[in-house]
């Protein structure tokens, strides 16, 4: 390690990685929230923890706002939940190998939270930044931010800028200014059961009907337009000697803009049964609207690139990515938004997830300059 500061950053991040906080483990998320809250409070930030219900971890809010300061400020967004189940640390322990710090949730996105919060801790006193800074850490981003979305949008309504701690894109630590919108279709087919040997002709196979629907859905994929439709799970039938009466599938779709979103939603809602005497139950929604690179976001990027240069690295803009994040919500509200400002590394959602130790000081310096001077 190059310096004592890097050693301190590594030690802090390692301690956070020891707390497993998968999305479906509210107790673990609550423990992680308490760790983050204690760190923020010790720095002098105002901290609030809010319950989002028994099946979801708490929402964490930290700020350097002075009492009564209602000016639009900087909103930092992060999430404390991970995709890794409890017990992952046993097979993928926190460790350093060369320049890589491995551990579940390291890259996505506990190191990013640690860097941004450490920078904010240095300007915790009200008035130490040009704009007030609000830091919101949600417990359910990996599962769609269903419980926290309303709170994200509430804070974003009073934000001049939104900065998101999702990990930097691999191979250069690029930031993100455009993300596809994400949606989900739950399709249920109801047929008619019958004995598969004695009364086969009286049955109406839900699986047969679903096969037609799967082909129609997958055909909605249009790579030239940036649209993908993927039937992710499918289940149907009960026993082999009964014509299946029920079949269901769950479909993921990604769209680059609202025009494409409206087109896909319309086509899915207009799905019709191919066979006789079967029914379709269609439940489809756009979970995250597309994050489109606006002129305002481009201007913010140009400004922020100057802070990165002063911190010692080149901050490039990544192409539109197919994965969604909470940046989709703020961008859709018209808030200039930059994403992918977290730690540099690779391997999100895998057991090979890591961050690059040699980049930590530069990324921290970047956040320090950004929070102090952005106006």
Feature names for model-found ranges:
Residues 71-134, 143, 351, 356-358, ...:
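Active-site metal-coordination/substrate-binding segment of hydrolases
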């Amino acid at each position: 390690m190059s310096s004592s500061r890097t050693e301190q950053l590594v030690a802090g991040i390692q301690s956070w990685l020891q707390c497993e906080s998968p999305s479906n483990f509210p107790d673990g998320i609550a423990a992680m929230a308490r760790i983050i809250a204690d760190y923020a409070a010790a720095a002098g930030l105002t901290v609030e923890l809010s319950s989002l219900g028994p099946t979801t971890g708490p929402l964490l809010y930290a700020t350097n706002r002075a009492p009564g300061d209602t000016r639009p400020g900087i909103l930092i967004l992060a999430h404390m939940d991970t995709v890794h189940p409890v017990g992952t640390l046993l097979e993928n322990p926190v460790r350093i190998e060369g320049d890589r710090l491995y551990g579940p949730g390291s890259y996505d996105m506990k190191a990013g939270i640690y860097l941004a919060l450490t920078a904010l801790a240095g300007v915790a006193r009200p008035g130490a930044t040009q704009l007030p800074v609000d830091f919101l850490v949600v417990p359910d981003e990996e599962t769609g931010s269903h419980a926290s979305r309303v709170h994200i949008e509430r804070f974003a309504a009073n934000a001049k800028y939104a900065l998101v701690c999702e990990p930097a894109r691999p191979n250069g630590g690029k930031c993100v200014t455009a993300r596809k919108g994400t949606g989900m279709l739950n399709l249920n087919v109801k047929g008619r059961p019958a004995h598969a040997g004695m009364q086969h002709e009286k049955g109406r196979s839900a699986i047969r009907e679903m096969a037609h629907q799967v082909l129609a859905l997958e055909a909605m994929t249009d790579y030239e337009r940036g649209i993908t439709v993927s039937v992710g799970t499918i289940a149907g039938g009960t026993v082999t000697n009964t014509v299946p009466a029920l079949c269901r599938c769950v479909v993921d779709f990604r769209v680059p803009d609202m025009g494409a979103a409206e087109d896909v939603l319309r086509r899915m809602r207009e799905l019709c049964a191919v066979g006789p005497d079967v029914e379709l139950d269609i439940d489809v929604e756009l979970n995250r609207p597309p994050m489109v690179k606006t002129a305002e976001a481009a201007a913010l990027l140009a400004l922020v690139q100057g802070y990165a240069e002063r911190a010692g690295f080149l901050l490039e803009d990544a192409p539109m990515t197919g994965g969604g994040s909470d940046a989709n919500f703020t961008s859709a509200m018209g808030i200039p938004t930059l994403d992918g400002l977290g730690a540099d590394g690779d391997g999100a959602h895998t057991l090979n997830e890591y961050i690059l130790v040699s980049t930590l000081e530069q990324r921290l310096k970047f956040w320090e300059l950004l929070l102090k001077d952005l106006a």
